[in-house]
UniProtKB/Swiss-Prot annotation:
Binding site for Fe cation 2: 94, 146, 178, 181
Protein name: 3-demethoxyubiquinol 3-hydroxylase
Keyword Repressor: no
Origin organism lineage: Bacteria, Pseudomonadati, Pseudomonadota, Gammaproteobacteria, Pseudomonadales
Pfam families assigned to the protein according to its UniProt record, in alphabetical order: COQ7
Species name: Pseudomonas entomophila (strain L48)
Catalysed reactions, semicolon-separated: a 5-methoxy-2-methyl-3-(all-trans-polyprenyl)benzene-1,4-diol + AH2 + O2 = a 3-demethylubiquinol + A + H2O
Binding-site residues for Fe cation 1, renumbered to this chain: 64, 94, 97, 178
Underlying gene: coq7
Length: 215
């Protein structure tokens, strides 16, 4: 029977640094699943459509950077081993989304946001603080965040042209995964945040979306 490996605080910090580099450096994240866009044909898009879709995908990419940092921060301070493992597993799935979005951004001749390091640091700190409060709050924060992401994905799917099958396939699969993460966090005992807290989180999300659409 395999024994679970126990990491020292230094080991965990080094792992966090490695994850941060793989999240922020171009083409560093290797997805476990192939991009859903692979089987979709190329679409004929005009310059304005291409620029707008690239902006939306840049927002989604930064959202995945934030999710990765959030999960890593929570995993660092989670009190129960099973909660820590759940956070780490969710972070691994977010790597897929991160890589898929970056691939699509490059295909559209654009680039990820230069603000990603800033948002990574902020999200990591929020995640670590949530984990320090309690695992229940930490899991609740995951659920609220993922529900907010699903809302953004729905809005973006309404804006992306029907003939852009590549972008739509990526966002549709992300939508399925994020909803699963949210429900799993609640089923694990996550706290359901009240409306005022969710509203505050939505305001912070708007800061991210407005700033990363162009840069």
């Amino acid at each position: 029977m395999a024994t679970e490996r126990h990491y020292s605080p230094l080991d965990r910090l080094l792992l966090q640094a490695d994850t941060a580099m793989r999240t922020l450096l171009p083409f560093s994240g290797q997805p476990a699943r192939p991009s859903p866009a692979i089987i979709q044909p190329d679409a004929e898009l005009d310059e304005q459509q291409t620029r707008h879709i690239a902006g939306l995908m840049r927002i989604n990419h930064t959202g995945e950077v934030c999710a990765q940092a959030l999960y890593q921060g929570q995993a660092l301070t989670a009190k129960l081993p099973q909660v820590r493992k759940a956070m780490e597993h969710a972070a691994e799935e977010e790597i897929d989304h991160l890589a898929w979005c970056e691939q699509r951004i490059r295909q559209l001749n654009s680039h990820p946001s230069v603000l990603n390091p800033l948002f990574y640091g902020m999200s990591f700190g929020i995640g670590a603080l949530a984990g320090l409060v309690s695992d229940k709050v930490s899991l609740g924060f995951v659920a609220a965040t993922e529900h907010q992401v699903c809302k953004h994905l729905d809005e973006h799917l309404e804006q992306i042209p029907e003939n852009d099958g590549k972008s739509r396939a990526i966002l549709e699969q992300m939508r399925v995964d994020e909803e699963h993460h949210a429900e799993s966090a609640l089923e694990a005992g996550g706290y359901r945040f009240p409306a005022p807290v969710r509203f505050g989180m939505s305001l912070l999300a708007k800061v991210m979306t407005k700033s990363t659409y162009r840069i």
